[in-house]
């Protein structure tokens, strides 16, 4: 009986100690986080290049398309320069043809190719797939983008870039006609419009993550339309 009383007393003291350590001396003043929250993952359909490769094994070559900005190239320096030059603090520069003439003439020689794009394009070319680039950019008076992309990604059978911006189109999303015209099976892009254009065309859209320091803000919601999202695709 005495032993039982001793054990009960010890248990009470231990519980009291745990309670003391667990209690907050003062309420938090900021939202903060904890180790458990930091490791939580959203229920997103993540996919890897290796998984895609295995999935496509044994299948006939297909046509695939890529958006350019924040998908295959980190081109924010060009857009930052354009905004500072043509409309500081505003996005009016995106409607200025002089900006598009300048950026498309050769600014992308200073853009950084994303490693995820290198990996994807290498995988698709090894399969014999055709690669197309479909961008929301407005065409300039000179296309300096196509040769930059061909060199950066070692494209064997290069097709001219499709500039869809500023065109009157019969679809809701401006990349949809290009996707349909080239009989694309998979379209890769970072923006909501990329995923929605793929849906409009009735094909598979796969999201690439946008770099956190991109000038293209706000950031889109990954998996917001139920699309697959490539892991480690922000660089």
Curated annotation (Swiss-Prot):
Pfam family, one: Acid_phosphat_B
Enzyme's top EC category: hydrolase
Localisation per UniProt entry: Periplasm
UniProt keyword Cell wall biogenesis/degradation present: no
Example of a GO cellular component annotation carried by this entry: outer membrane-bounded periplasmic space
Alphabetical UniProt keywords: Hydrolase, Magnesium, Metal-binding, Periplasm, Signal
Binding site for Mg(2+): 67, 69, 190
Record: active site: 67 (nucleophile), 69 (proton donor)
Signal sequence bounds: 1-22
Cofactor: Mg(2+)
Catalytic activity line of the entry: a phosphate monoester + H2O = an alcohol + phosphate
UniProt similarity note: Belongs to the class B bacterial acid phosphatase family.
Protein's job: Dephosphorylates several organic phosphate monoesters. Also has a phosphotransferase activity catalyzing the transfer of low-energy phosphate groups from organic phosphate monoesters to free hydroxyl groups of various organic compounds.
Subunit structure comment from the entry: Homotetramer.
Name the UniProt record assigns to this protein: Class B acid phosphatase
Gene name in the database record: aphA
């Amino acid at each position: 009986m005495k032993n039982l009383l001793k054990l009960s007393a010890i248990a009470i003291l231990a519980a009291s100690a745990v309670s003391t350590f667990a209690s907050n001396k003062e309420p938090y003043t900021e939202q903060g986080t904890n180790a458990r929250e930091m490791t939580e993952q959203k229920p997103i359909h993540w996919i890897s290049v290796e998984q895609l490769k295995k999935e496509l094994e044994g299948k006939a070559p297909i046509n695939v398309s890529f958006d350019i900005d924040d998908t295959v190239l980190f081109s924010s320096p060009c857009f930052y320069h354009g905004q500072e030059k043509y409309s500081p603090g505003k996005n009016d520069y995106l409607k200025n043809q002089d900006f598009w003439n300048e950026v498309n003439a050769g600014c992308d020689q200073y853009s950084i190719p994303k490693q995820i794009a290198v990996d994807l394009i290498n995988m698709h070319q090894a399969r014999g797939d055709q690669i197309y680039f479909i961008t929301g950019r407005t065409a300039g008076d000179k296309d300096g983008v196509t040769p930059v992309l061909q060199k950066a990604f070692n494209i064997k059978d290069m097709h001219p870039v499709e500039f869809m911006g500023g065109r009157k189109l019969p679809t809701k999303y401006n990349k949809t006609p290009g996707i349909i015209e080239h009989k694309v099976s998979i379209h890769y892009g970072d923006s909501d419009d990329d995923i929605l254009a793929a849906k409009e065309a009735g094909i598979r859209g796969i999201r690439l993550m946008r770099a956190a320091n991109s000038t293209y803000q706000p950031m889109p919601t990954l998996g917001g339309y139920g699309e697959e999202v490539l892991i480690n695709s922000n660089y």
